From Swiss-Prot:
<protein>
    <recommendedName>
        <fullName>DNA-directed RNA polymerase subunit beta</fullName>
        <ecNumber>2.7.7.6</ecNumber>
    </recommendedName>
</protein>
<dbReference type="GO" id="GO:0003899">
    <property type="term" value="F:DNA-directed RNA polymerase activity"/>
</dbReference>
<dbReference type="InterPro" id="IPR014724">
    <property type="entry name" value="RNA_pol_RPB2_OB-fold"/>
</dbReference>
<dbReference type="InterPro" id="IPR007120">
    <property type="entry name" value="DNA-dir_RNAP_su2_dom"/>
</dbReference>
<dbReference type="InterPro" id="IPR007644">
    <property type="entry name" value="RNA_pol_bsu_protrusion"/>
</dbReference>
<keyword id="KW-0804">Transcription</keyword>
<dbReference type="InterPro" id="IPR042107">
    <property type="entry name" value="DNA-dir_RNA_pol_bsu_ext_1_sf"/>
</dbReference>
<dbReference type="InterPro" id="IPR015712">
    <property type="entry name" value="DNA-dir_RNA_pol_su2"/>
</dbReference>
<dbReference type="Pfam" id="PF04560">
    <property type="entry name" value="RNA_pol_Rpb2_7"/>
</dbReference>
<dbReference type="InterPro" id="IPR010243">
    <property type="entry name" value="RNA_pol_bsu_bac"/>
</dbReference>
<comment type="subunit">
    <text>The RNAP catalytic core consists of 2 alpha, 1 beta, 1 beta' and 1 omega subunit. When a sigma factor is associated with the core the holoenzyme is formed, which can initiate transcription.</text>
</comment>
<dbReference type="InterPro" id="IPR037034">
    <property type="entry name" value="RNA_pol_Rpb2_2_sf"/>
</dbReference>
<dbReference type="GO" id="GO:0006351">
    <property type="term" value="P:DNA-templated transcription"/>
</dbReference>
<dbReference type="GO" id="GO:0000428">
    <property type="term" value="C:DNA-directed RNA polymerase complex"/>
</dbReference>
<keyword id="KW-0808">Transferase</keyword>
<dbReference type="Pfam" id="PF04561">
    <property type="entry name" value="RNA_pol_Rpb2_2"/>
</dbReference>
<dbReference type="InterPro" id="IPR007121">
    <property type="entry name" value="RNA_pol_bsu_CS"/>
</dbReference>
Length: 1342
């Protein structure tokens, strides 16, 4: 493959044996597409805002004389861009305007005659917009809406697995779940009667529902049963025979016909008997009259003469009734066919317990159940039942629900709509009875064909609809008040409910989460997360094992590895690398189509429902050159996800890639296939907690997924169009766009402004650093600047560290690590953390708070870092307790003593009526002030500092826009110059003229003259655009800020803290091998090899065998080989060996092993080879893709090429004694991460602090400045030691003996060290609790 200029800088050697068939898709599609569907203009109105509006409008008044119709909507432009919203703490949103039409009809004229139409645009609140990276900025913080995995609408058949009833009998049930509306359940009870529930309420016999639908008893029996015909002839009974129905029964009489006995009495009827009966075509047999006794009549039999009901439907027939029927002249009788095996009499039995007899009584029963205590009327009962399942406003199955419903009942795809029909309900009951009879099986709730993804767009649409429904009620009320002549749509609509519903969803829904912004990976995974919790989902407590477990249908859709440890395990999942959602919201995964044993190029996405019908081969099945399977039998997944061996011609699909099973985070773990799943889970989760280091370092051993993640996360700057770097500095990159990518007549310049040292949600530092140089060519989609944790466009979460697996004086006991001082000196794991501290000046009852440097009772030194406005200056180094912003609050007037009054009269001192409420640096924090922002309310005078900041911002904005204009103008004029020179104007002549005069030249060639005029117009546009931009920017900077009620001023101070690595910090590898640093050892004491090179971290070898994460050992070996090759290249460069030798060696390294990637260095120029070699000096980056990685032989060959022992083990010497260790040690390079669990954030000690109100015990936790808990077990320990006095002070003066501890404090202050303990407060609490139970308890003080 050809490499671009940027890609040639550093090529990662790939060990993957299988060529990539499908590139990794854009990783944030699930978020962006969903929101796009929400705000797009959908002409069909099937989804998004359009669908919400169409479902609620038109709103018709109760008398039908007026209606409010929806015409269209449009979203305006947001006022501030994303960055400004984050700084100002506002929401990034666009105003929504809806065009509505109020139509009033003339009631006196013919129906439909229009009297008046008013059309108007109505403001409907603001809709938060998604940023380019799939997040929302709500009140200045970035949030992510996590997708939800919920039960798909449709019908589900299930059983209780014998757990409900003590007998262990399996009870089946069916549940119709709509997208919105009431649930309808059908269930069997232990007596085999069928019941129905609406909305999980009290159960009713299911036949009540059927009666309410208008079915009579006869019709009900007709729907659910087959019939047996009996004929009465000469006091004999003839039965119409269907031989199949006799299977398995015992004959209670001789079955004979045509004089031949087929089955003797008492014999069991077998399949052979049935075949003989069918062969002889026996259709009727004589039966004794007793045979009909106990059978159930299938319809009403009425004596036609007297009109008397002889035998109602569903009545058991006795000999008396048989005689009456014969007497009434009936020649044939129909009864229900039932048996115990596969035709149960369930509906017939249920009809017997059904209290209703006709439609009305059934409707009344339903009404009583839904609205207990209300007197039913016929209309109310009918309306209620109608609204439950048959009104489109109250009930909607949705397209998904209808599709699932029809599939389940075996109906055609297009049948039916969003509401239920009679046939639907009967169909569900029939299928449920079939399942009870042993035909068909229950659904698997955890199958991904029964669970679907609800993404941002859909959830926002639902919230929006809820808001609109609230508005609808208010509008209906207003319309029915009459007097509508002067009313416009704007008067009718109050947008508050809509914007409130939307705001609530984005701001405080369980699924709207504060974005995890530790590093680019954590951002990407957060956006790809799938939660089963949240509104309409499961709750942690109720979720059982089955829901959390890995299901075969997860394959390629949901990652089996990445899920949190703890109570949410299995409820929060991550999308697999290639997975996507289809139109119905079901997860699909791609497969290569296989035709006649040959794998084609065609790729198809299958959902879990479709996948069950195919035979699918794995990605690692071996293929020949023609993409045919080489093995006679291939391991595949067949029906229902069971794996087995199949012949090549039976295979229909094949996996796309070996890594399609896992998620993005798990795909970053090299040698994942050699790790135990539990450790892999920890590894995937801990990579998300890695803090971006000061200097990002690409992993030597990667998986090839590093690039796509870094690009898709949006932290790096990516070129929109190809071109040449025209200008680059730390904060801006300018690209001159290639001619073929520019639009005719534009300047062809792209300007990229970089983000410098801003704070992330997790207080880590976001900073972009250019990685291109002046004059370099770049292509579209290539990286121009690295963000946090990216290195040349690759994800770089940690550092490559030289590790040794060996014990070292117990310093690596229990997973702790011994770290060399060199790691600290080289700032390998130094990180920058940025904290935001804010000070708010409010308007209080006693007067306004003031931000000032004039603070009472504070010495000069404390104010030394503040300017005259009382705000700390940028660049000040501050530590715990320092004042950042001086603020005074008025306090109430106090009674003054005569002396004070006198002093005040003499000195006129008025300062004592304010108290100091300044913003100080928290105790455990120290750092440098890197930025200050001042926000002032409209109408409040700005202080000097605010004006300075404003001035600076204006200056910068002007400079930015002027430079931008300068660059664009230069680009434009260079094109003008070329055009003029082409048109025959002399170049020297041109250079003498002023540039603006160039545009006034005339050319003979008409086409060129037109082009020149176009360029002149553009120049004018540019100037106007510049003025406009400047004006807008100026307006934004100068205008007052929109602050919360009662707030006059907000000052935000940003502190940067540099954290070096130190004992107590948590570090981890990528294989779940985590540990805490126990000691930082001097370099000279660390073990070293024969070349005198010391190791940087010593790890405990005992951490490997029991954890079974062997991946870390393989990574260490491969890392050593990568470094070895780097060192060989470095040596060749130092010795200035000829380029061909260098080229040959690098080529040899790339060619080693059986990887499918081929790098041909002969196509590289010498300069490119040199640049590549320079980038490979520190080690050759390798990629070992998940499940398709490097093999043992390849690792050995690579070690050999690097001039290293193939065992991967080296003889080490003790740094303290210089003695050789007695056996070789595994040494190599492992990629280590520093996790966001820093000892600085956890260290805490309490002096005197706050106490809990009730128990009077100190609070707990660092945030509350709490104490250390001395719990039950610690008390036992002291008891065991018999340390009575220590125990006494622990339980009294050091805890909750209020008087005792005050006395103790006084004693310590006065220097008398004695203690007199009293009663602990907790004793008083228990006494009061006992009293509250009505038992009086008193202390006898002796």
């Amino acid at each position: 493959m050809g490499y671009s200029y940027t890609e040639k800088k550093r090529i990662r050697k790939d060990f993957g044996k299988r060529p990539q068939v499908l590139n990794v898709p854009y990783l944030l599609t699930i978020q962006l597409d969903s929101f796009e569907k929400f705000i797009q203009r959908d002409p069909e109105g099937q989804q998004g805002l359009e669908a919400a509006f169409r479902s609620v409008f038109p709103i018709v008044s109760n008398n039908g004389s007026t209606e409010l119709q929806y015409v269209s909507y449009k979203l305006g432009e947001p006022v501030f861009d994303v960055r400004e919203c984050q700084i100002r703490g506002t929401t990034f949103a666009a105003p929504l305007r809806v065009n509505l039409r109020l139509v009033s009809y003339d009631r006196d004229a013919a129906p439909g005659t229009i009297k008046d139409i008013k059309e108007q645009d109505v403001y409907m609140g603001e809709i938060p917009l998604m940023t380019d990276n799939g997040t929302f900025v709500i009140n200045g913080t970035e949030r992510v809406i996590v997708s939800q995995l919920h039960r798909s609408p449709g019908v589900f058949f299930d059983s209780d697995k014998g757990k409900t009833h003590s007998s262990g009998k399996v009870l089946y049930n069916a549940r119709i779940i709509p997208y919105r509306g009431s649930w309808l359940d059908f269930e069997f009870d232990p007596k085999d009667n069928l019941f129905a529930r609406i909305d999980r309420r009290r159960k009713l016999p299911a036949t009540i529902i059927l009666r309410a639908l208008g079915y009579s008893t006869e019709e009900i029996l007709d729907l659910f049963f087959e019939k047996i015909q009996f004929e009465i002839q000469d006091n004999k009974l003839l039965m119409a025979l269907v031989p199949e129905r006799l299977r398995g029964e015992t004959a209670s009489f001789d079955i004979e016909a045509n004089g031949k006995v087929y089955v003797e009495r008492g014999r069991r009827i077998t399949a052979r008997h049935i075949r003989t009966l069918e062969k002889d075509n026996v259709t009727k047999i004589d039966v004794p009259t007793e045979y009909i006794v106990g059978k159930v009549s299938a319809k009403d039999y009425i004596d036609l003469e007297s009109g008397e009901l002889v035998c109602p439907a569903n009545m058991e027939i006795s000999l008396d009734i048989l005689a009456k029927l014969a007497q009434a002249g009936y020649k044939s009788i129909e009864t229900l066919f039932t048996n115990d095996l596969d035709f149960g009499p369930y509906i017939s039995e249920t009809l017997r317990v059904d209290p209703s007899s006709d439609r009305l009584s059934a409707l009344v029963e339903i009404y009583r159940m839904m609205r207990p205590g209300e007197p039913p009327t016929k209309e109310a009962a009918e309306a209620l039942f109608d609204n439950l399942f048959f009104s489109a406003e109250r009930y909607d199955l949705s397209a998904v629900g209808r599709m699932k419903f029809n599939r389940s009942l075996g109906l055609a795809e297009g049948v039916g709509n969003g509401v239920l029909s009679k046939e639907d309900i009967v169909g569900v009951m029939k299928k449920l009875i079939d399942i009870r009879n042993g035909r068909g099986e229950v659904d698997d709730i955890d199958h991904l064909g029964n669970r679907r993804i609800r993404s941002v767009g859909e959830m926002a649409e639902n919230q929006f609809r809820i808001g609109l429904v609230r508005v609808e009620r208010a509008v209906k009320e207003r319309l029915s008040l009459g007097d509508l002549d002067a009313v416009t749509p704007q008067d009718l609509i109050n947008a508050k409910p809509v914007s409130a519903a939307v705001k609530e969803f984005f701001g405080s829904s369980q699924l709207s989460q504060f974005m995890d912004q530790n590093n680019p990976l954590s951002e990407v995974t957060h956006k790809r997360r799938i939660s089963a919790l949240g509104p309409g989902g499961l709750t942690r407590e109720r979720a059982g094992f089955e829901v959390r477990d890995v299901h075969p249908t997860h394959y390629g859709r949901v990652c089996p590895i990445e899920t949190p440890e703890g109570p949410n395990i299995g409820l929060i999942n991550s999308l697999s690398v290639y997975a996507r959602t289809n139109n119905y919201g079901f997860l699909e995964t791609p497969y290569r189509k296989v035709v006649d044993g040959q794998v084609t190029e065609e790729i198809e996405y299958l959902s879990a429902i479709e996948e069950g019908n195919y035979v699918i081969a794995q990605a690692n099945a071996s293929l020949d050159e023609d993409f045919r399977f080489t093995d006679a039998f291939v391991t595949c997944r067949g029906e229902h996800g069971e794996s087995g061996l199949y012949r090549p011609e039976e295979i229909q699909y094949m996996d796309v890639s070996p890594q399609q099973v896992v998620s993005v985070a798990a795909a970053l773990i090299p040698f994942l296939e050699h790790d135990d799943a539990n450790r892999a889970l920890m590894g995937a989760n801990m990579q998300r907690q890695a803090v971006p280091t000061l200097r990002a370092d690409k992993p030597l051993v990667g998986t090839g997924m590093e690039k796509p993640i870094a690009l898709d996360s949006g932290v790096a700057v990516v070129a929109k169009r190809g071109g040449i770097i025209q200008y680059v500095d730390a904060s801006r990159i300018v690209v001159k766009v290639n001619e073929d990518e520019t639009i005719p007549g534009e300047a062809g310049i792209d300007i990229y402004n970089l983000i410098k040292y801003t704070r992330s949600n997790q207080n880590t530092c976001i900073n972009q650093i250019p990685c291109v140089n002046l004059g370099e060519p770049i292509g579209r989609g290539e990286v121009l600047a690295d963000g946090p944790s990216t290195d040349l466009g690759e994800l770089a979460l940690g550092q490559n560290i030289r590790v040794a697996f060996m014990p070292w004086n117990g310093y690596n006991f229990e997973d702790s690590m011994l770290v060399s001082e060199r790691v600290v000196q080289q700032d390998r794991f130094t990180t920058i953390h940025i904290q935001e501290l804010s000070c708010v000046a409010r308007d209080t009852k006693l007067g306004a708070e003031e931000i000032t440097a004039d603070i009472p009772n504070v010495g000069e030194t404390a104010l030394s870092k503040l300017d005259e406005s009382g705000i700390v200056y940028v660049g000040a180094e501050v530590k715990g307790g320092d004042i950042l912003v001086g603020k005074v609050t008025p306090k109430g007037e106090t009674q003054l003593t005569p002396e004070e009054k006198l002093l005040r009269a003499i000195f006129g001192e008025k300062a004592s009526d304010v108290k100091d409420s300044s913003l100080r640096v928290p105790n455990s924090v120290s750092g440098t002030v890197i930025d200050v922002q001042v926000f002032t309310r409209d109408g409040v005078e700005k202080d000097k500092r605010a004006l300075e900041i404003e001035e600076m911002q204006l200056k910068e904005a002007k400079k930015d826009i002027a430079e931008e204009l300068e660059i664009l103008e230069a680009g434009l004029f260079s094109r003008v110059r070329n055009l003029l020179i082409d048109g025959g104007v002399d170049a020297k002549e041109l250079d003498r003229l002023d540039r603006t005069k160039w545009l006034e030249q005339t050319l003979n060639d008409e086409a060129k003259q037109n082009q020149l005029e176009q360029l002149a117009e553009q120049y004018e546009e540019l100037r106007k655009d510049f003025e406009h931009k400047l004006e807008v920017k100026r307006g934004k900077i100068i205008q007052g800020d929109d602050l919360a009620p009662g707030v006059l001023k907000v000052v935000k101070v940003y502190l940067a803290v540099k954290r070096r690595i130190q004992p107590g910090d948590k570090m981890a590898g990528r294989h779940g091998n985590k540990g805490v640093i126990s000691k930082i050892n001097p370099v000279e004491d660390m073990p070293y090899d024969e070349n005198g090179q010391p190791v940087e971290i010593v790890l405990n070898p005992l951490g490997v065998p029991s954890r079974m994460n062997i991946g870390q050992i393989l990574e260490t070996h491969l890392g050593l080989a990568a470094k070895g090759i780097g060192e060989q290249i470095n040596r060749m460069l130092k010795e200035k060996q000829e380029i061909e030798k260098l080229r040959g060696y690098i080529q040899k390294a790339y060619d080693l092993g059986g990887g499918s990637q081929k790098v041909d260095l002969n196509t590289f120029t010498d300069e490119e080879v040199m640049r590549l070699a320079q980038n490979l000096r520190k080690g050759m980056p390798l990629a070992t893709p998940v499940f398709d990685g490097a093999e043992e032989k390849e690792i050995k060959d690579l070690l050999e090429l690097g001039g290293l022992p193939t065992s991967g083990q080296i003889t080490l010497y003790d740094g303290r004694t210089g003695e050789k260790f007695e056996r070789p040690v595994t040494v190599g390079y492992m990629y280590m991460l520093k996790l966001n669990h820093l000892v600085d954030d956890k260290m805490h000690a309490r002096s005197t602090g706050s106490y809990s109100l009730v128990t009077q015990q100190p609070l707990g936790g660092k945030a509350q400045f709490g104490g250390q808990r001395f719990g039950e077990m610690e008390v036992w320990a002291l008891e065991a030691y018999g340390a009575a006095y220590t125990l006494q002070e622990m339980l009294t003066v050091k805890s909750d003996d209020v008087n005792g501890r005050t006395k103790m404090y006084k004693n310590i202050v006065s220097g008398t060290h004695q203690m007199d303990p009293g009663t602990p407060e907790s004793f008083n609490v228990i006494m009061k609790e006992i009293r509250s139970l009505g038992i009086n308890i008193d202390l006898d003080e002796e």
